[in-house]
Amino acid sequence: MDIGKKHVIPKSQYRRKRREFFHNEDREENLNQHQDKQNIDNTTSKKADKQIHKDSIDKHERFKNSLSSHLEQRNRDVNENKAEESKSNQDSKSAYNRDHYLTDDVSKKQNSLDSVDQDTEKSKYYEQNSEATLSTKSTDKVESTEMRKLSSDKNKVGHEEQHVLSKPSEHDKETRIDSESSRTDSDSSMQTEKIKKDSSDGNKSSNLKSEVISDKSNTVPKLSESDDEVNNQKPLTLPEEQKLKRQQSQNEQTKTYTYGDSEQNDKSNHENDLSHHTPSISDDKDNVMRENHIVDDNPDNDINTLSLSKIDDDRKLDEKIHVEDKHKQNADSSETVGYQSQSTASHRSTEKRNISINDHDKLNGQKTNTKTSANNNQKKATSKLNKGRATNNNYSDILKKFWMMYWPKLVILMGIIILIVILNAIFNNVNKNDRMNDNNDADAQKYTTTMKNANNTVKSVVTVENETSKDSSLPKDKASQDEVGSGVVYKKSGDTLYIVTNAHVVGDKENQKITFSNNKSVVGKVLGKDKWSDLAVVKATSSDSSVKEIAIGDSNNLVLGEPILVVGNPLGVDFKGTVTEGIISGLNRNVPIDFDKDNKYDMLMKAFQIDASVNPGNSGGAVVNREGKLIGVVAAKISMPNVENMSFAIPVNEVQKIVKDLETKGKIDYPDVGVKMKNIASLNSFERQAVKLPGKVKNGVVVDQVDNNGLADQSGLKKGDVITELDGKLLEDDLRFRQIIFSHKDDLKSITAKIYRDGKEKEINIKLK
């Protein structure tokens, strides 16, 4: 690649150097832009960036000028190095020829002297090296701070120059040259001081050692001279300087000299082993420059890089001390080896240095990759977080816009919803209250009707007491029997009251004391009574308007479980007007009644069963339904141990038939067939055989006596006939026979009977009139 001024280089090398040059300038520009962003508006910084990128032509021109000057200087340096190498080769050959014939005694003496002074030299050398290390570290810190200050100044100046699109100033180049020259001067001074101190220590040990060290020190000024020449050269950028040194080391590796001697080869091998552990001064310089370059490239990692460089410096100093001690012990052998061993050692030390440089570069690359990956992960996490926040912000913005656009409608809608909920709750409460009121009203109505019926019934129920007995010949205890009971006013005609009660209440007394609910009393007269139905009618007169006629119901329509009220006067006047409540527990009951108290039942009373409380004094009281109408008259209760609330009432329809005859006739005319009979159940076996009764007959009656010219005699009944059916109904006993006959008291029709006579079954008609 022809770059002008009669210089030709490979194209790949040209591109590499151009990239390095542009990289350095871009890095400086980026630093300047980073500082400008803190002080200048975004608009100004963007304009400056555009102007910088437009100045690509000027960059190429500056690069070509810099590269051409660098190549000229390199050619001069190469020529000078060749001259110096030829001169040094001649000197080394003469020194080798002069020292080749030294005896082994010199080496033995040198080894003994070295063993004596080994400990003292180590301590002194360690102190000297530690002081030199501290001085180098301090100078490095000062130089780094100076470089940072200079870079900041450059950034400011570069920012000013970016607006005018000018080239970098000469002041920056001079400061760079001064910093690099000061660094190289400090390194060369440290090397000369170390060599002088080593030479002074060698003079104290022995004269022979002083001669060897003096010969060795003669070579040191050459190094310093070369360093001075390098310092006088025009400074290059850091990457270029590093590459130049690598090329020089490679040139040194190609220089080999053959001096045929097995002993010399063994000594050179020993020296080479030591040289593997000996870091060179140029290695230190390269490391320092590399560290400075890394610090400049990445200002954010200055602290970490400096700490790593300090650790490497300490490790290298320790290795130097150890290797220098061994080097002093084998100084004679190393000098007798000659230039061949020196060149081989330098070759191996150069390889070691290159390996250490490569390892250091790999370590820095790994650290850089690790940091880069960590930064990338952090950037990804930050970007995800920012995206999430942006999404949330977008949602919030959308909601805000929606609210700003439609908030009046939303407020109205919410108000309507709240109003609907409130109205619904109000209507539900109103309906609930209405239902509760309806239920309460229904309950109140029901309760009021019940109470009304009870109060009306109480006005129609009276207390009945017999005053005197008509038959004065009866014993007092018998005359006082059933003295108090209850009665019901079933009809009122003006001031005349017709009261129905039980026959066993009035007894055989004609006059009865009637007491009303208002405690007024009158005397009533018994119009008629019937012991077979246990009913009686009393007539009384009263102008008291509070006494009411009771309403009459229909007992043919009774329902099992129908609620009823019982009103009467239990235990006399003191508890008059007592009301008890119950239900109809049974219908069509046949209740046996003992009227004359001879412990023998006289009649089957047709009644319905109630469970309301009935006590002595309730006989003749009223049983009303839920409408307050009379459906029955209390007649009896079962008074037996362990029996409760089993009472019976005569149906009102039967009562009406009886009281009608009692009002007009004063008695009830029942048909009398003129027979006496026994129950089959009471017959013994002899009596059953006498009447030739079949074994299958279990119930019925046996005619025991027939009146002459009576209805039974006229009908053809004979003594010994067994009657099992009457009027199409099974006949259980004589009470049932009387009940069936009395049930036809009104029509007096003939009824059919099934009988057994002489063991044969037959039917006959019994006349009732």
UniProtKB/Swiss-Prot annotation:
Lineage, broadest ranks: Bacteria, Bacillati, Bacillota, Bacilli, Bacillales
Start and end residues of each PDZ domain: 680-733
Ranges of biased composition (kind: Basic and acidic residues): 21-64, 71-108, 138-186, 264-287, 348-364
A Pfam short name: Trypsin_2
EC number: 3.4.21.-
Region Disordered, annotated ranges: 1-287, 324-390
Protein name per UniProt: Serine protease HtrA-like
Principal location listed in the UniProt entry: membrane
